Amino acid sequence: MSGLLSRLFPQRPKATAEQARQLQQQGAILLDVREDTEWRAGHAPGARHIPLRRLPARMKDLPPRRTVITVCRSGHRSAQAAALLAREGRDVVNLSGGMNAWARAGLPVVAGGGGPGRVA
């Protein structure tokens, strides 16, 4: 049974907020898959924004051969995005706990206009 479960729900690498920030600083793409209103309220500096529902059509917008760190508010939508990207052969890591964990770690959150943001 565990073999079937691992094939149905393969584990994706996960990162803490601090690890994700370090990967981003080393050149990984931090991909925020939340909706537009969530993004505008607050996101990680330097993140790219492609809502989960648009990701299948926009995967080509992501540079190949770069690690992608997926993030949403809590980690669930980003896990779906990570699975989708992994099926396409991308090197992908899911930010465990999402933007909630990012903010709890004291990492910066900026609003759509560039000022201080909040996780929505």
Listing of model-derived features with the role each one plays in the protein:
Residues 1-29, 36-67, 78-120:
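Rhodanese-like catalytic fold shared by cysteine-dependent sulfurtransferases
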Residues 73-76:
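Residue-level detector of alpha-helix initiation sites
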